[in-house]
Swiss-Prot record:
Pfam families: Ribosomal_S2. Keywords: Ribonucleoprotein, Ribosomal protein. SUPFAM superfamilies: Ribosomal protein S2. This is Small ribosomal subunit protein uS2. Belongs to the universal ribosomal protein uS2 family. It comes from the Archaea. NCBIfam families: uS2_euk_arch (TIGR01012). One of its GO terms (biological process) is translation. The keyword Transmembrane helix does not apply. It comes from Methanospirillum hungatei JF-1 (strain ATCC 27890 / DSM 864 / NBRC 100397 / JF-1). The keyword Ribonucleoprotein applies. The lineage of its organism: Archaea, Methanobacteriati, Methanobacteriota, Stenosarchaea group, Methanomicrobia.
Length: 202
């Protein structure tokens, strides 16, 4: 998809429309959930749903501001999705959060007897489907959840939705980079990091 297929303007965007499109942030799936309909820009001829990057841009700002209210050490970043693992860890390391990358051990938030038992104040996940276990546990212990949500995701268990392609390598790198940059800005820091610093090697 090129720029003229999404002729929109962003209000004080974090990056340009072209950069969002180049990263594939807008590319959804061929399924649309009722929860995500307000974040969808259009459906392509091949049946692929396209996310509205105006919503993505605003929700990244919202999520970063929300997360910046917390002590970074009390933010838990969880992802089992392959292309989410490197950027999620880089995000966690950059802001001082705690990452759980790969397999999530059930009971981490609910069973104090586990060696890796955690008591975060907020949880960030890459995909509400593959990271469902931690979301369920967060609800049990009343911890808010920030989630990267694609067109097919249900969001009823999520407190802050960031609409994005949550499967693509470049898209996840861009989203976690922008969350990092905005989070640090709210904390009073600048960063020299770039989206490429968050990109998983092929």
């Amino acid at each position: 998809m090129n720029g003229n297929e999404m002729e929109i303007e962003l209000n004080e965007p974090l990056v340009s429309v072209e950069e969002y499109l180049a990263a594939g942030v807008h590319i959804g799936t061929q399924q649309k959930s009722s929860d995500m309909k307000n974040f969808i820009y259009r459906v392509r001829g091949d049946g692929l749903y396209i996310l509205d990057i105006r919503e993505t841009d605003e929700r990244i700002k919202l999520a970063a501001k929300f997360l910046s209210q917390y002590d970074p050490a009390k933010i838990l970043v969880v992802t089992s999705r392959q292309y989410g693992q490197y950027p999620a860890r880089r995000f966690a390391d950059s802001i001082g959060a705690t990452p759980i990358i790969g397999r999530y051990i059930p009971g981490t938030l609910t069973n104090p007897l586990l060696p890796r038992y955690a008591e975060p104040d907020v949880v960030v996940v890459t995909d509400p489907v593959s990271d469902l276990q931690v979301i369920r546990e967060a609800i049990q212990v009343s911890i808010p959840v920030v989630a990267l949500c694609d067109t097919n995701n249900m969001t009823s268990l999520v407190d802050v939705v960031v609409p994005t392609n949550n499967k693509g390598r470049k898209a996840l790198s861009m989203i976690y980079f922008l969350l990092t940059k905005e989070f640090l800005r709210h904390k009073g820091y600048n960063t020299s990091l770039t989206p490429e610093d968050f990109e998983t090697e092929m």
